[in-house]
């Protein structure tokens, strides 16, 4: 009886030892399997994470690029708008200045015609006539020189003719000459421009006995 109890206890102890050994041998296998699964998951998940990170980075980059392009375009438009406004304002001022200059020069030739339309004495027996021709201040030097030479020649010829004939002036002619002298003295008071004097003096057809004092050509009247 004791022997039977001893064998049962021994069998139970051996069975427990075997179960513990099997459980102990299964535990490393389970641990190894779990570690393998974790490693496999770690090997798979990083790829997914990398793919997610790369795709997210691309999306973020695209979004940043779009935002940067929008900001740059808005800044450029904001910079261009004031420049365009400044250009338009400058153009307006420039156009106003041009219009004022054009209006001034449109009035300027008409202003020059008035002093030139003064009385011109042609002959002592003629009446005072008013010249209404347009004024051209540009006169060539060659024309002036030729006109001076021609006027000197005509004066010399007419003076010689007058002295050869030795004509006597009547009282009416003397009165007319005095009247012309008064007119010339009256117009000497005005400060005429020099170029108007030269042009006006060379365009007059004067006689030696009707020579005014304002003439630039020297003339001595012999009695």
Swiss-Prot record:
Location in or out of the cell: Secreted
A single cellular component GO annotation: extracellular space
Signal peptide, first to last residue: 1-15
GO molecular function: protein homodimerization activity; zymogen binding
InterPro entries for the chain: Alpha-s2_casein, Casein, Casein_CS
Pfam families: Casein
Keyword Signal part of the UniProt annotation: yes
Predominant location: secreted
Role, per record: Important role in the capacity of milk to transport calcium phosphate.
Protein name per the record: Alpha-S2-casein
Source species: Capra hircus
Gene coding for it: CSN1S2
